[in-house]
Amino acid sequence: MLEEVKGAQERANVPENSIETKAGDDRSMYVYVPASGCPDAKQTQVVMFLRDGADEASAQAAMKEYGLDALAEKEHFVLAFPNPRQSGWSERDAEDMDYLSRCFMALPQGKGKVGGFIGMIFYIGGSPSAGALLLAMSARRPLNVAGVLLSELPADYSIPQDGVNAPQVAYLCGGAARAADYFGKVNGVTGADARPLEHAVLYTSPVNPNVRHIVSELPFSAQEAVRAWDMLFCKARRWSNDTYGTYQKRTDFTARGFVAHVNDPGLGVNEGFAHTWYEYVPPRLRGSKEKAPLVFYFHGIGCVPLYGAEQSGWHDIADRENFIVVYPKPARNKAWNIWDEPGMPSDQAFVLALLEHMKRTYAIDESRVYISGFSMGGMMTNALACAYPELFAAAAPCNGFNSGYLVPASEMWTMLRKMPTGRGLPDGPSEPVTRTRVRADAKKAAFAYRMPLIQNSGLLDGTWPAAQDDPFKRLASFDYWKTYNNIPLTPYEPAAACESGLTADETFYDCADGRFLHHRWFSRDEGKPALFEVVLAKRMPHALDLRQLELAWQFMKRFSRGKDGSLHIDP
């Protein structure tokens, strides 16, 4: 189908899937949406094939010659054919690069009504000029290029010297093999990192095994397209969590043994609402009666559970550390009911019912149930931590703060209704004081609970140092958990040398590359345990770094919850 690509659109403001470009000319593209269907947009890959023609016949011919329609039907990706201008593709024309980004933005608004994930856009250069453009784009704008397949390069082409030298997944067919030295350089590989294949060599980065490129002796063909997909494209995802992103491996959920509950009314909660969640049990625990910890992970607004699984990698940590993971989906509109607003299904009741289901189904150590989440899922984590401290031993919210307690629903309602996920919301909240706050205050008044909490975020997510009037209440959230855990409040110093403006009992940089600014506060309780920590990633916007979850697990696993609500700490 022919789709318009408006030149005026410069930004797609979608949570965790935004892309920025520059305005340009109104152009068009042809799009093939597989009849077999696509997953949620944030789990959908997009393959863009650049050809020299600009008509439907040339798109159809390329699709059939290289078997791309059959591959799209099998693998459920969106196939796009951007149309070149009359002068053809030019690696010297920034408008062509901007236009390719606008093609991605145009997909959800088009006739196909299907989107993809910015970190899973793969490009195929079907001609020398297209290959030159894509090599220039991967060199200069790598964040928007998850992978490239180059079939040919112009005879007089010179590798860009003004690139940023970022790692890049790539497949080089015979006519583009002379770019091998460039990809070897940016991916940091040597001959020791090479593995011979039939008529090709696979190179794997010694720093990140998810960064790979293949140099093939063969010309581009349908068979080469399949090999590029099977060995590279289906395994690659570039998350926008650093200056030029980070490649992480994809998860084969079926092969890993995820247990899916899709639209399952069996929990008997929310008047029989059909809830969705996914369970993961490490192989060593399957069929075992040995009690194991349980981790809940709540994805961000506008996302889905399997996206959250790949984003967080909790199941990979579970394999090593022997715990069970559950990835729930909110009842409505991919947004968590963090306030427990009665005009909507109760996601908190859902989590409680799901916890009981997990205890009936598996051998769960009830004293070691932990919660974590990202963005609005981080808000959900905060809300559950204060509303149900008797059930959870520790919490690790990421990029979402205690808005469910600190921010009246009325303050966020207008914003939520404007978002794509806000369709069908009531006109406004039905109660002035949220049930989350009422429940949390009552629990704390009845017992001196402590809630160990490690808050993750990025130093490019919002403005740091944070303002006191921050609408998401970052500083107020920090002070809430300090007070909750009997930690003295410390002054906030926005002019301090520390990037965050936070003053803590301990401040240090984590990991060999100094990526994480780590703050730690100690309770005045006996033994002075560290019950509150904040970890901020340098160069990171609204995203996650897998190493933050590793730090979160090292923090949380030390804590367990007694039946009387008391907190126990391993030495």
What is each model feature region?
Residues Q60-L79, G308-V326:
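Short amphipathic alpha-helix adjacent to the substrate-entry channel of hydrolases
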Residues A80-D98, Q311, D319, F323-Q348:
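Cap/lid segment of the alpha/beta-hydrolase catalytic domain
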Residues A176-A177, L460-P465, P541-A543:
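Acidic catalytic loop of the alpha/beta-hydrolase fold
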Residues M1-V46, M63-Y66, K74-V78, N83, ...:
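A domain-start/cap signature at the N-terminus of enzymes
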